[in-house]
Amino acid sequence: PCVALLATGVGLFKGNLTALVGSLFPPTERDAAYSRFYWAVNLGSLPSGFAGGWLHSHYGFHAAFLVCFVAMALVVPIGFLTRSLFHPIHQHETESHHAASERDRIATILGLLPVAVVFFCAFYQSGSSLTLFAKNNTRDTLMGIAISPPAYQSLQAALVLGMTPVLTRIFRRWPCSTRNKLLIGMGLCSLSCFVMSDASMVSSFWSNHGRVSPLWLISSYTLISIAELCVSPLGFSLVSKLSPPKFAGLLMGLWMAAIALGNLATGFLGILWERWSHAAFFGLLTGLSASAIPLLWAQRQRLDRVLGVQR
């Protein structure tokens, strides 16, 4: 029941909130809007790893879940009291004026769904294989500072918070097309998995007691966090901008379903964690992530056309 309630609540909340963000801004401002939205999401997740791990170790699971309950209970009155602040712009203002047909725009979104599945399959390893690697194969101190496995979850959020303004400034100074940002994201995702494949080989053959430096995980998390900023908020923005108004909800739902499918694939791949060597496991993820790059490249002309080669 707990997981079912959690899944239902997240489905109702996250999908509608994401669509609401798109309705509040014109197409030209949505990339920046979703980047700020994504920044806020990670601001909320930053203390969870540290606080959850500390509460569990000192007071047990019941204390950690109680704090979650209190935090979520506060969201309801806040949302109710601030509901009048949201003023979606009129439908005719949000409608795209690209020359591309509705069919082209829908086909572009559908063509990006497999890329989303592959990316999030690798991305959500942070909650499964990477956490297990942190627990069983990584030293728990760095320069005398203790690092618990749950702390890496907060590290990822902290990296997103820190890198968002940096990447915004970089792309403002050196403009990059949407297509190229997606390609960069998938390339960094593949490189992140490759780093963990190398770390696994070090753990197996050269490191004492099979434990490696936390710097391996930190490097991998840094790469996947930058990749996340190039793919995830941009994906929401793309769907919001390209969706014909009458299909906007459906197509945003399909994008969310692709994310969920990637998460599901993470669980299925987790079966291989105990059956394969860790190096082979992360090698598989490296190959899967890299396979999305030619898939994106094959769609580059249509993607540029429907976006008007937006930069």
Give names to the regions the model predicted.
Residues 31-57, 69-75, 153-157, 252-266:
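Glycine-rich segments within core transmembrane alpha-helices of 12-TM secondary carriers
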Residues 27-31, 47, 52-145, 167-175, ...:
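Intracellular loop-helix junctions on the cytosolic face of multi-pass helical membrane proteins
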Residues 1-13, 205-230:
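Hydrophobic core of transmembrane alpha-helices in multi-pass small-molecule transporters
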Residues 27-37, 146, 214, 236, ...:
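Loop-to-transmembrane helix entry/capping segments in MFS-fold secondary transporters
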Residues 54-70, 177-180, 211-212, 271-290:
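A membrane-interface helix-boundary motif in multi-pass transporters
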Residues 1, 187-209:
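C-terminal ends and interior cores of transmembrane alpha-helices
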Residues 145-174, 185-193:
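Transmembrane alpha-helices of Major Facilitator/SLC transporters
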Residues 12-26, 229-243:
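Intracellular juxtamembrane helix-capping segments at the cytosolic ends
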